[in-house]
Amino acid sequence: MADTTGRIPLWLIGTVTGIAVIGLIGVFFYGSYSGLGSSL
């Protein structure tokens, strides 16, 4: 796993993935609290 992707840094991928996961969890809990998540 020592080979880097070259164009895209690994920390950038981790940061974007983390923000996306946190955003999806936030939207899911917000929908659950507002009653929109009950249909999922």
Swiss-Prot record:
Compartment(s) of residence: Plastid, Chloroplast thylakoid membrane
GO CC entries: chloroplast thylakoid membrane; photosystem II; photosystem II reaction center; plastid
Source species, domain of life: Eukaryota
Pfam family, one: PsbJ
GO biological process: photosynthesis
Membrane association type: Single-pass membrane protein
Plastid keyword on record: yes
Function as written in the Swiss-Prot or TrEMBL entry: One of the components of the core complex of photosystem II (PSII). PSII is a light-driven water:plastoquinone oxidoreductase that uses light energy to abstract electrons from H(2)O, generating O(2) and a proton gradient subsequently used for ATP formation. It consists of a core antenna complex that captures photons, and an electron transfer chain that converts photonic excitation into a charge separation.
Subunit structure: PSII is composed of 1 copy each of membrane proteins PsbA, PsbB, PsbC, PsbD, PsbE, PsbF, PsbH, PsbI, PsbJ, PsbK, PsbL, PsbM, PsbT, PsbX, PsbY, PsbZ, Psb30/Ycf12, at least 3 peripheral proteins of the oxygen-evolving complex and a large number of cofactors. It forms dimeric complexes.
Family indicated by similarity: Belongs to the PsbJ family.
Full protein name: Photosystem II reaction center protein J
Organism of provenance: Oryza sativa subsp. japonica (Rice)
Gene name tied to this protein: psbJ
